[in-house]
Structure formats: C-alpha cells, structure tokens
C-alpha cells in the first residue's frame, strides 16, 4: 500500500538505538521533510557507555592511571545470524565509524571460551560439535540429548507456539532444558517457561516442524532460497567489509556502543532533525487528526503527518489504543560494573564470561558475568589494558519476578550481592578491594515475548493499518527481536518504506503469520 505522498512532517518517539537509527535514515531518505526526535529521557536509551578515570598501584609497584570505558547496556555485536547483521554493519559504515570497529576473530579466546557456572564451578561450553565429546557434565548431557533427539517424534498436531522450556524439555530432556535456561538468562533475562519459542528461537521451531527433528533441520538448513539470496546480496553490498566480517566471531566499537548512538544523534541533528531529549521531549498524548497526528508536548501541540514510535509497547499503549501492546511482560536487569587492580589472568580464565542456569549458584540473583577485559579487548582501556580487570555482573531478570523475588528500589542495593557473588566464584577477590563499582538498575529493559507473540503482532499490524491509515509505524525491541541488530533492522525497514512513499506499520513481517 502506498500513501499519496511521502510524509513531510515526521515525529520519531524514543531516542534509543531504534529511534536514532530511524531519525538518521529518514533525514537522508527524505531530506526535505521536517523530522522531530522526541524522548522524555536521555539520548541513547539502554545503550550507555561510561568513561571513568582510575589510578592505582599495580602488584609490581607501578603507579598506573588512565581512562576506561564501562558498559551499562549492550556491548558486542554479532556479524551473522540474519538480515539485521548486514544492516547494522552498513549503518556503522555509513555513520563513519568503520575505523572504530574492533573485531574479535573466531580464533580468539573470547570466541572459543564461554562458560556455565554450576555448583561444581565453571564449565566450558562446547564451541563445536566435536568438543561435545570431551568430558564435562554439561557436554556429556548435551551429547546424549543431541544423539537421541532425531528419534523423538514431534507432536501431532504440531503446536503453533510453545514456551522455550516446554520445547527443550520435550525435545532434549530436563537436563538440557536446565542448561538452556542459562542462555535464555543471557539473551532475554527471562524465565524460559514464559518465553515464546517461535519468537525467540524460531529456527528451532521451523527445523522440527519441517524435518521432524531439530538436529536434522539444522544440518539441512531451514532458511528459504529467497532469504539466503537476500542476505548474500546484503553482504555483497558491503564489499570488502562484508568479506572481512566472515572471520569475526563478534565485534565491538572503540569507545563503546555509546559511540554509535552519539554519532547517530549528531548526524541526525546535522541533517536538520529537531532533537528534543529530556522534559521538553516527553510526549503526553497522541491524537489522530484529519490527515495527520497531533502530539502533545510540554511546549504545546506538534502537528505531523506520520509518527514512528520507538517507545516500549507498554508506553505506547498509554498514547494509542492498539491491541496487545500490554500482552508481554518486561524484565528488570541489574548491571554492576566492577574494576579490580589485578590483571585478568590473576582472577579468571581467558574468555567471554559465564552464564548461570536457573538456581545454580544464584543465591544473589546473578544471571551471569562478562569478562569485559578479555571479552572485548581494544575497546576503550588504552594503556591500562591487561593491567586491570573489568567485570560486569548481570542480575535480576526472572529472579525479580517470575522466580518469586522483587527488584530492589535502588541500584546501590546491587553492590553487596554482586561483590559477594564474585568473591565466591573467584577466591582471589576475597582480599582485593575493587577500584570502581558502578551499579545500574535497568527497569523493564527487555521484553519477554510470551507464547503467541507472532499472532498478536499480526493483529496489531492489522489494527495500525486499519485505524491509523499510514500515519503510524512501530519499531524497537518490543516487537521483532531484542538484539541491537534486530532493532536496527526494524528501524531501517520503516525508514526505507516511508522514503519510498509506502504506508508501513513496521510489522509487515507478521502480516501472514499463521
């Protein structure tokens, strides 16, 4: 469906990564349009890269001083795994940040060494199928379950959706479902029993549905020829950069993820976008008018032709009467950055970090720990790299909700349990005072897609198309994926569609969901 003309006045609500991407791309696609970027809080959303000055005496007696970067939100990016990966890398290139890319090759310890924390200590997660043959309780359980999976019959009739916990228990058994809870904690900070398999790990649903077995489906592939061709074309468009990323396991940005949101905000403003963040950018109401939308702001009404909402669905529900916006819960995640005056090798094994299955060694509601110093070297510690240790403790999520607990009212309450967790896990820290501890309480930051999410998005798409008639689009983690790649892709698609004069809801992918 097309609209009579591309909108000349556009408001983007929300200045996180999705909203910034939408505003930046719209300012290029529609250079004659008047674009407003509105957010009642800070620019950047959940992306937050903090700089800290530290000074300490090393174990060798050397006085060291310098600036380090700590992340309160996302910190690494995957260079594969769907159409969002090339979209993100293209955005970084177009924003002029290609020189800031810090690639982590597939041979790097951070790519090969990832751990689970079990009651018996840290267990390395097998990075390859062959490694499953090596002795460890987790690998042995996975190997036996994978070997038996092709012989399990799929249910009839096949479910349209189910929880992640139900699926893993049914296909691989309770032990593997328990191990899988750690990965759900790391990605969604959610209870696997509440999370939609089809929306969170759709490739597993498709593999079993098509081939009767997840293992056989993964071996044969489930992507359509059209999807494969589109992804190849997207990578080819990136030329040499698209080729180089084939050797990367992941990548980060020098200076942190905040370098990207800052650059997008500055570029959008330079392109003429009216950026209002803080109290002046808080939207209190949306009202459809004859051929546009009236937005209520503290300074008065703002008339636009089109609204792109990058707000969380529950926040949008306060402004627009649309179905299903409050159907999914969101989890609150505590993030505690801790810096010690010891080299990483004196504290933890080389690698990315560890995740914790439900209830395993999690008396302090810990979900996992990132070994920032070895996971993402070269991203912002300068001459101090290798001489101090940065760790990030992730806490809460389902432990402050589905598992029965409640979130603390202040981020300061996270410090004691985070330090206690680290001291139990790494004995070297029991007699070492940290240089820096910075707690963050990210309230309702990650949506939990409840089973049936895709069908509900189809209904929401239909309602937006019918009731808003080309005047509203939605983007962000609340709809089509929680990763930074997913967020960028959704914003890119909406901006491109509006630039072509199309009426886009942002939910076209779910229009044929069954």
Task: Label each region the model flagged.
Residues 18, 43, 314:
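Conserved Rossmann-like nucleotide-cofactor binding loop
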Residues 126-130, 368-514:
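Conserved flavin/dinucleotide-binding core of flavoenzymes
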């Amino acid at each position: 469906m097309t609209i009579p003309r591309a909108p000349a006045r556009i408001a983007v609500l929300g200045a996180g990564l999705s909203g910034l991407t939408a505003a930046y791309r719209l300012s290029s696609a529609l250079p004659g349009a008047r674009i407003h970027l509105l957010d009642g809080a800070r620019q950047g959303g959940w992306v937050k890269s903090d700089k800290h000055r530290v000074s300490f005496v090393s174990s060798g007696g050397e006085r060291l001083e310098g600036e380090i970067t700590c992340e309160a939100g996302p910190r690494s990016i995957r260079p594969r795994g769907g159409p969002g990966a090339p979209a993100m890398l293209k955005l970084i290139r177009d924003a002029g940040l290609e020189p800031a890319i810090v690639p982590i090759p597939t041979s790097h310890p951070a790519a090969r060494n990832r751990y689970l924390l079990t009651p018996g200590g840290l267990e390395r997660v097998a990075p390859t199928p062959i490694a499953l043959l090596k002795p460890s309780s987790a690998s042995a359980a996975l190997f036996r379950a994978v070997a038996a999976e092709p012989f399990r019959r799929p249910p009839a009739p096949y479910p349209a959706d189910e929880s992640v916990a139900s699926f893993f228990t049914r296909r691989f058994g309770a032990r593997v479902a328990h191990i899988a809870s750690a990965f759900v904690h790391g990605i969604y900070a959610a209870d696997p029993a509440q999370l939609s398999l089809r929306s969170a790990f759709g490739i597993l649903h498709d593999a079993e549905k098509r081939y009767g077995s997840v293992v056989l489906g993964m071996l044969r592939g489930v992507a359509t020829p059209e999807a494969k061709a589109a992804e190849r074309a997207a990578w080819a468009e990136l030329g040499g950069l698209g080729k180089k990323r084939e050797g990367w396991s992941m990548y980060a940005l020098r200076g942190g993820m905040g370098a990207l949101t800052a650059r997008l905000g500055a570029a959008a403003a330079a392109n003429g976008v009216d950026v209002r963040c803080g109290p002046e950018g808080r939207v209190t109401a949306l009202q459809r008018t004859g051929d546009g939308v009236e937005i209520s702001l503290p300074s008065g009404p703002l008339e636009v032709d089109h609204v792109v909402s990058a707000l969380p669905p529950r926040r949008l529900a306060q402004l627009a009467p649309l179905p299903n916006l409050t159907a999914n819960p969101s989890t609150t995640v505590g993030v505690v950055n801790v810096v010690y005056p010891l080299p990483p090798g004196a504290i933890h094994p080389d690698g990315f970090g560890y995740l914790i299955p439900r209830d395993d060694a999690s008396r302090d509601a810990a979900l996992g720990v990132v070994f920032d110093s070895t996971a993402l070297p070269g991203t912002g510690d300068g001459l101090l790299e290798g001489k101090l240790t940065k760790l990030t403790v992730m806490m809460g999520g389902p432990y402050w909700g589905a598992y029965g607990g409640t979130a603390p009212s202040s981020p300061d309450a996270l410090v004691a349990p985070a330090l206690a967790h680290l001291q139990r896990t790494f004995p070297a820290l029991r007699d070492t005072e940290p240089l820096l501890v910075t707690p963050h309480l990210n309230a309702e930051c990650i949506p939990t897609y409840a089973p049936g999410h895709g069908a509900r998005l189809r209904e929401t798409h239909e309602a937006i198309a019918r009731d808003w008639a080309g005047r509203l689009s939605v983007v962000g983690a609340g709809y089509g994926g929680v990763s930074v790649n997913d967020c960028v892709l959704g914003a890119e698609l909406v901006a491109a569609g509006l630039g072509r004069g199309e009426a886009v809801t942002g939910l076209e992918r779910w229009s044929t969901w069954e």
